[in-house]
Every structure is written in structure tokens, then in C-alpha cells.
Amino acid sequence: MLSALGLGALVYTIIEAPARGWTALPTVLGFCAAAVLVVLFARREIHASQPMLDLALFRDRRFTAASVAVAVSFFALYGFIFLITQYFQFLRNYGPLETGLRILPVATCVAIGSVAGTVLVVRLGNKLVVTAGLLSLAVAYAWIATASGATSYREIVGQMVFLGLGMGLTSAPATESIMGAVQADKAGVGSAVNDATREVGGTLGVAVIGSVFASFYTARFHDLPRLPGGLTQQATESVGAAFTIAGQLPAAPAGALRAAASTGFYDGLHAGCLVASGVALVGAAVAAVALPARPAEKG
């Protein structure tokens, strides 16, 4: 319960921060509440006779670094899906099916990267492979941050190749490291932590990247002439809503609204991608420092 409340408070605060302000009192209190709940959860687990999560496992640098790597990889993947679907549907005017087909290179490269990762780990070790995967994610996001209306689909495919391969190279070897770091009688706990890091990483990816995106997107509407009936506020909710509203307006205000929404979208896309790239770089640094080159054999 405490863990769910803590994560829920954190995600809710991050999502609401663009509207309330990152330094507003409700936002600060939300982050404080999330921190308190997480600390209470940790203390409860430490003193429990049969803890739901054995925090002692995180004393193992291999286990901790691999968990961070898995979380970061899913942070990147879910954040990318959040951004790219809007880009294809609203900025490129593709339908849902067309959008899904154009994202297929990511899934294909994740599969290829996962297979390649398990092979490369045998020759190169977990540290090098996982670090390379996270660096590939960082490169992918830094490249995506340069996207504009003139970006060709071929270039986007290149970005997706880096992202998919990075995801595959990271997640499969990191998962092996998590499971390899626990004793046989703790395998269930290791599997649960692996699943939890994926879910938490993905959830935070959408929340953090989405909130950064929203902060920059809405900023473009501040200088826009007010529209009747609260339409300006509705337009700030999403680029799709802005384009729908623009279709109901006369030519002049419609053009201004579309321009603000398009520019705001790219502002948010660039900022969100740079944040994600930074997170991937931090994950790569953790993997490079904490993951062993070759895991010790268990006796």
C-alpha cells in the first residue's frame, strides 16, 4: 500500500506540475509526500520478518545497477512511444494504423538487439553491452531532439534503429544480471523486481517526458490572443485538441492556433528528448561503474 501510494503521489505530482508550476506549493508538497511514503515503505520492509521486497538485495551493486538499467530502458521506450505517436498522427497526419506500421522498426530492432545482446554478453561481458545499449538510447534521443517538420521518415527510421537496438542490448543482459545476482531461493523476488522496474520505469517515462513536453508546449499559448468559450485552455491540453479547435475557427485565428500548437509541440519534443537522453546517460554511467565486467560464478 505504501509503495503504491508513494509512486502514485510521485506520478500525479509530476503530471500536474506543468499546470500548477514546478515550484508551486502543491507541487513541492506532492514531492515531499511521495518521498515520505517511499521512506516509510523502506523502513517497513527493513523491519518486516517477511518483507514484500528484500531491500538487502540492493546492497549488491550488480543487482542495483541492472535494475537501474532496466528502469531506464523502459523509461526511454515508453517516453518515445508517447511522443512519436502524437508526432505521426498530428504533425504528419497519419491514422492510427499508419502510425503503428511506421513504429514497427522499433519493435524489430528491439528483437534483434535482444538476441545480439545475449550473444555479445558471452564475449564482451554485461558491463560493456549494457553500457553500450544505454549510450545508444542516449544517442537516439539526442538525434530525435533535432526532429522538425522537414525530417524525412528515413531519418526517423535511423533514430528508431538506435533506440530499438539500445533497448534490446540493455534489457536482456540487464535482466540476466538481476536474476544472476540472486540465490535460487530468491528467484521469485528477483523476477518481481525485474517486472517492477519495467513498470516503474515505463510509468515514470510517460510522466516525466510528458510533463516536460507539456510545460514547453503550453508556453507557446501564453502570447496567443484569447479564444472565446475557453477554447485556448482546451487547446493547451494536446496538439490534437488544438488542431481540432483550429478547424472550427476563421482563417486568421486558426492559422495562429495551428502555428502555436506546432511550434509548441516541437519545443516540447526537443526538451523531452533531451531530458530522456540525459537520463540514459546517467544510466550508462551507473552501468559502467557498478556492473561487473564478468559476473562471478556462483558456487
What are these regions (language model features)?
Residues 175-177, 181, 193, 197-292, ...:
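Hydrophobic transmembrane architecture of multi-pass small-molecule transporters
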